[in-house]
Structures are given as structure tokens and as C-alpha cells.
Amino acid sequence: MSKRTCYAGDVTAEYVDQEVTLKGWVQKRRSLGSLIFIDLRDREGIVQLVFSEEFDKDALAVANSVRSEYVIEVQGVVKKRKPQAVNKDMKTGDVEVEVHTITILNKAKTPPFYIEDGVAVTEETKLKYRYLDLRRPEMQKNIFTRAHIMRSVHHFLDDNGFIDVETPTLTASTPEGARDYLVPSRVYPGSFYALPQSPQLFKQLLMGAGFDRYYQIARCFRDEDLRGDRQPEFTQIDLETSFLTAEEIQDITEGLIAKVMHDVKGIDVKLPFDRITWQDAMDKYGSDKPDLRFDMQIQDVSELVKDSDFKVFAGAVQNGGQVRAIVLPGGADKYSRKMIDAQQDYIKRFGAKGLAWLKVTSDSISGPIAKFFGDGADLVKAVGANAGDLVLFVADKAKVVADALGYLRTHFGHDLGLIDEQAFRFCWVVDWPLFEYDEGIQRWVPAHHPFTMPNEEDVHLLDTDPHAAHAQSYDIVLNGYELGGGSIRIHNREIQGKMLKALGFTPERAQKSFGFLLNALDYGFPPHGGLAIGLDRFVMLLTGRDNIRDVIAFPKNSKASEPMTSAPYPVADAQLKDLGIEVRADVDPEKEHEGDENLTE
């Protein structure tokens, strides 16, 4: 093979009248008899090749035999296109290469789908032929953007005194949250390693070892139910520091994100980011990861309706609940009763019993509950509605109200076109509760993880009322997605012991699960804290995708399997025998895991 002159996508006017050698894939071929055009594709783009008897008769014959996705090498001379043939949509659109030599480096079967953006093909097929899917320009762009982000992260953290340290991939199973992926030990029959759900404990130990500032682009593994922005194996930008306050860690993180946004998107984000307490986020936006690209704040009308004749509202308040509302500007004419009822059915999944609504006119109100509120003037004023608006109400327990209205706010924000899809709005959510109640397993769990330091003024509550304590934790949110989270950690063994006790750990169980950390805390650990940012989610948001599978080279599908390699699949009996493992076919995985610990977010 000859040495490549440049990438096909880089052949521009500066190469005119120069001899070039190019290599790549045949995107498409067009034959006009004595003239053949081939679009040659590589990672940088596409350039048009021209074959003619005038240039070389043999090259024309070979060009006539090639098909899509053949791998070829060509030599030729770059020429300017005729004005009427210029393609302004292509970087190389004002030139073409007159080819005199072509070599077929490899043939290709007809692909199961066209290698082009926007192709209509099932997700399963794209994953089965991922190596073909990754040839598409938008997929290449996603992976290059990911690499660009990682490069920017490395540069910033290296320049700010952080040291890149690898932590173990084979480690001990600890009750950190989701189910562990277990790896059986052949050397120790019946014993297992676990793949890390995060480097959390190891990075704390590195602070105890005196490294002061650690980072890692860390691979993490969690055996949990999947959704669009989750994968069983994922990557996070992991940081930990010693002797810094939460505010100082947030400042460093803002600097990191500002550099990435500048380097990758050419955007200078406004610093510092907005800060909102967890309680305000839930009250105003119905979410602990609020989308601040639009306003539409939730309004509390509990006091106004507690004595109303509408028993649903009055009863909710009397039973310790709330009545809250959102206003949909211009929604009165846009949404019919049928459309509103469809949302009423949807919010029942959050525990809401129903959705009340009013339409505002110039001098009155209408709707199923209008008769209970006269002309509705006080109610309209309280929620800040105007003529033509639609007001939605939910009455229930605080969490149910927040979850339901938070969903409705986001849904209608998109539907009404209130969200600038090109905007990036970062914010911090701070002052979290230390614990939250998990209705699914009917017990208290950490809002983040069991190594989070309570607020200084709340440490004493670990002895008396731990569930009232707040934490030195903070989440960074982008456009309604949790981008990352962190906290100041517990560096005192006594406080860590109280935290585990509040979670129901006996001293013996705490020592068995976290003994190595508890023992280490006896040897002079510094105050420390950190943060982790989900790299996959960050790339997804910066590339405008809606699924992290689009920004991971070889992801799993929604069933945690990989169609390309067929993983996971049964292994040979001999391998199982070496490990002392017997496979049972009658296991119900859900029942097997009932009562599992859930200690993290």
C-alpha cells in the first residue's frame, strides 16, 4: 500500500492540481457509462472521485466493479469542480479527484442497512452490526466528541494538581446500592469478587493516604434496571480532594465544565452556576433535578383552598397533604378535556389520585371544579394565571404532588415549546436530606450514600433523630438531568459508625461490610470530599442525543445484553466446574433479591 496523503474529508481547494493518495470506503457509486463517480468516505468525511477513459481505462474498469462499503485505495489529481457541480453542503464540495489508479483493498457484502444518517433500522439490528452502525457520520461524531471531552477533562485536572490514579476492577462486594456484578474466584472456591459500582471507598482511602487531589475516568458496573440514560457498565469522571469545602469543590467542578463547554461546544458558560436547595427544587419544580431552561414554577394554593367546598382539596390539606398547581400559558384553547384526561391517567403511576383543572377566561373560569370557586379571581391571582391559560392542580401527599406536577411541568414545557432545546442550563442542588424514605422497600436509605457527612449543626441528630438531618451533599444538574453528584465525606470513625447504625447496621455487620474503611479512619484521615460526573450522560447531552447508547462505542441493549457478541450466554460446564459453580434453572431473580440493601442514590 502507498502512504496516504490526507483524509478524504480533508481534500479541499488547497490540494487543487496536486497528486493525492486516498483510502477509505465506497459510500456510493454512480455510473454514467464512460464516466463513473464514487463517493469515498473516511472518518473525516466524503470526497467525490471521478473515473474516465480519459484518465485511465483500467481504473474505470475496476471502478465499475466496486460496490458500497468496498475498501479502496486511489491515486489521482485534485481538480476544481465546474461551478454548476459544486456541492455547498460538503466540506469537499468544490473539488473532485480525477483517479488514474484504484486498488480494491477489501470487498464487502451488501450491508443490512445503508451506512448513512437517519437510516430507518431497528435498534437491535444496529447493535448486532455495531461495527457498521459506527461507520455512520453521526455516530463517528458522537465518539469523537466523547474523546474530545475526555481530553479536555484530563488537561484541566492535570493543570489543577489532580493525579490520575487507577483503582481496582476486582474488589469486594459491599452493600452500596444496586446489585453487584459478581466474579467467582477459582483460587478461592465459593468466594467472589465484585465489579465496582464506583471507586467511592478507594478514592476516600487515597485521601487518607495523602494524595490530596485524585481523579480517574472510571469504569463502573451496576446490575440495575435499565432506561435510556443508564447502562450496566458506564463511565464517570471521578474526583476527590482533601481539605476543601463543598463550595471549593463546586468551584473546581464549574471550572472543569466551563473548559469542556468552551473546548467542545465553543460556549462560554456563565459562572457561578445557580444554586438551589433541594427543598426549593422540589417545591418549585417538582424535581431534585430541575430543568431551568423554562420557568413554569409550581404554586402552592393549600391555604387558599383548605376551607373550600371542593372536598378533594380541603380533605388533602386537612390530612397533612398539599394542593399545588402549574399554569400552562395559552393552554385553555390548546388542550381538550380528552387530552387532559390522558395525563390524568399517566400521573397515577406517581400515586396521584387525579388531576383537577380550570380554564381561565377574561372574567371567569371554567372546568369541572369551577363551580366550587365562584369567579375564581383569588385562585387565578394566586397562581399568576391570565386569560387563555390552563391551570392544573394535584392534591395529595407532598412527594406525590411534587412527582406528578414535576412530570407535568416537563411534559407541557416541551409540548408548548417553552424550552430552548439549544440552551445549556447548569445548576447546583444543595442542602439535601441525609436520608430519604424508600416506599418500595419500606425503610430509610441514604439520599446519596452512607459515607456522606451531615451538616455540622446536624451531626448530633444521628443520636436522636437521624432522619431529620441534612447532608453536605450537592448534585450538579444540566437541563433536567442529574449530571453528577458529590459530598463532603465522613472522616471520623465515630460519626461513620453512627451513620451505619442509623441505617440499621449492627457493629458486627458494619465491621464485616466496611471494616477496612472503619479501620482506616482510625489512622488520621483528613476532611475530604469529591464528586462524580456521568461521562456518558454528559456526552449524550452535549451531542443532543436522547439515549446514552448513541455515545458509547459498544453498549448493551435495554435487556443488558449485547446482540453483536450474544453476551451474556452460557459457558462450558468445564469452566463452571473449575469455579465450583452449579447453575440452577429454577431461580426467580426478583424473589432472590427481595430485601437487598439499597444504600445509595
Swiss-Prot record:
Q: Does the keyword Nucleotide-binding apply?
A: yes
- What start-end ranges are recorded for coiled-coil regions in this protein? none
Please tell me where this protein is predominantly located: cytoplasm
Q: Does the keyword Cytoplasm apply?
A: yes
| Gene Ontology terms, MF aspect | aspartate-tRNA ligase activity; ATP binding; catalytic activity, acting on a protein; nucleic acid binding; transferase activity
The UniProt record gives the binding positions of ATP as 222-224, 231, 482, 534-537
Q: Where is this region: Aspartate?
A: 200-203
Keywords for this protein = Aminoacyl-tRNA synthetase, ATP-binding, Cytoplasm, Ligase, Nucleotide-binding, Protein biosynthesis
Cell compartments where the protein resides: Cytoplasm
Recorded GO cellular component terms are: cytoplasm
Some GO term, biological process aspect, for this entry: which one? aspartyl-tRNA aminoacylation
Q: Name one Pfam family in it.
A: tRNA-synt_2
- State the SUPFAM superfamilies in the record: Class II aaRS and biotin synthetases, GAD domain-like, Nucleic acid-binding proteins
Which residues of this UniProt protein bind L-aspartate? 176, 222, 448, 489
| Class in the EC hierarchy, top level | ligase
The catalysed reaction is: tRNA(Asp) + L-aspartate + ATP = L-aspartyl-tRNA(Asp) + AMP + diphosphate
Question: What Enzyme Commission number(s) appear in the record?
Answer: 6.1.1.12
Q: How does it assemble?
A: Homodimer.
What's the stated role of this polypeptide?
Answer: Catalyzes the attachment of L-aspartate to tRNA(Asp) in a two-step reaction: L-aspartate is first activated by ATP to form Asp-AMP and then transferred to the acceptor end of tRNA(Asp).
Q: Which family is this protein grouped under?
A: Belongs to the class-II aminoacyl-tRNA synthetase family. Type 1 subfamily.
Protein name per its UniProtKB record: Aspartate--tRNA ligase
Lineage of producing organism: Bacteria, Bacillati, Bacillota, Bacilli, Lactobacillales
